[in-house]
């Protein structure tokens, strides 16, 4: 929803009810991206490749070969790519299941025309769960107390709520029932005994992207689900068992079970060896101007960089408020006209400086690639992760949620 329409809706709600509307998450856009004119006027933006996304979906579906259902994880506004941008591709490629985190994400998924299976992949607050009933969404349950509370909410609305019971098989210790203890097993049995909850799936989530660790967690999950199915007298044919995230889906095929939950792989975020998956996002900015400074000058806050020669520095219209973090100070590189140039001085809130002394063709208005490809050059996932000290998702979810997004190709 464009800002002006969001503001109008909020104003009308305030006038009519005397209260501001409540959102479980910020309103997300249903538009097919920011138009090109808006991007040209933005200090930084994200480009999302529809062709790369569709290629990745087809590649993954071919790898699953119909043996496991694909559930596309679109939490964090589709990992920063924009649910409103990616849902047409999800629907076009026949993906049967979508997973989200917030009610606002669920709203956009349903508003896009998706009528398939919709699952929340984290525990909801009770108010979220109640509000989420309108989206026909399956909920995660990981404790007997929460199950009783969810049951009461469903009963109050005259509904039966479909649930996925989360088990702590891999030691994530976040959402799941601890089936390694007898008290935990008793709790799991209580969850299956709620009148207004229908158990449709058993799931776990792997804590480490390591094949041996995944297999250990999978073995525990298999034992625990076998026990629960037997002692709760569940019909296995009516249950979906799922555990695999993107890493486990691609690297440990036996973990795929009935369904896989893939997010990163859909957008090209995989282990380096999986080159068949294409990156769906690029992060870009502009050169504002190029300045000349003499040798000996310092650059930026705290004088962390001193020019060793007379230099030409390009002023880039992006900073840490846009998700280009200060950790890239004196370490990062960007692409301008295909030239790989270094970040010099501290990254500021809205500005960074790069050294373009060796490239006289660089001028104000040039496009800058902060992450992605340009004219044969590339700012890679590996280098960004090494400097940032974290998974790339720690960066690109922020880029996508802090800057305008546009759908390309």
From Swiss-Prot:
Residues 1-24 form the signal peptide. It comes from the Bacteria. The active site is at residues 75, 301. Disruption phenotype: Cells lacking this gene exhibit a limited capacity for catabolism of L-Lys and L-Arg as the sole source of carbon and nitrogen. They don't secrete D-Lys in the growth medium. The stationary phase peptidoglycan structure does not differ between wild-type and the deletion mutant strains, indicating that products resulting from this enzyme activity are not incorporated into peptidoglycan under these conditions. Keywords: Disulfide bond, Isomerase, Periplasm, Pyridoxal phosphate, Signal. GO terms for cellular component: cytosol; periplasmic space. Its cofactor is pyridoxal 5'-phosphate. Substrate binds at residues 174, 349. InterPro entries: Ala_racemase, Ala_racemase/Decarboxylase_C, Ala_racemase_C, Ala_racemase_N, Ala_racemase_pyridoxalP-BS, PLP-binding_barrel, Racemase_Bsr/Lyr. It catalyses: an L-alpha-amino acid = a D-alpha-amino acid; L-lysine = D-lysine; L-arginine = D-arginine; L-glutamine = D-glutamine. It is found in: Periplasm. PROSITE patterns: ALANINE_RACEMASE. The modification N6-(pyridoxal phosphate)lysine is found at residue 75. Its EC number is 5.1.1.10. Disulfide bonds join 71-97. HAMAP family: Bsr_racemase. PANTHER family: ALANINE RACEMASE, ALANINE RACEMASE, CATABOLIC-RELATED. Amino-acid racemase able to utilize a broad range of substrates. Reversibly racemizes 9 of the 19 natural chiral amino acids known, including both positively charged amino acids (Lys, Arg and His) and non-beta-branched aliphatic amino acids (Ala, Leu, Met, Ser, Gln and Asn). Among these amino acids, activity is the highest with lysine and arginine, and poor or very poor with the others. This is Broad specificity amino-acid racemase. It comes from Pseudomonas putida (strain ATCC 47054 / DSM 6125 / CFBP 8728 / NCIMB 11950 / KT2440). The gene is alr.
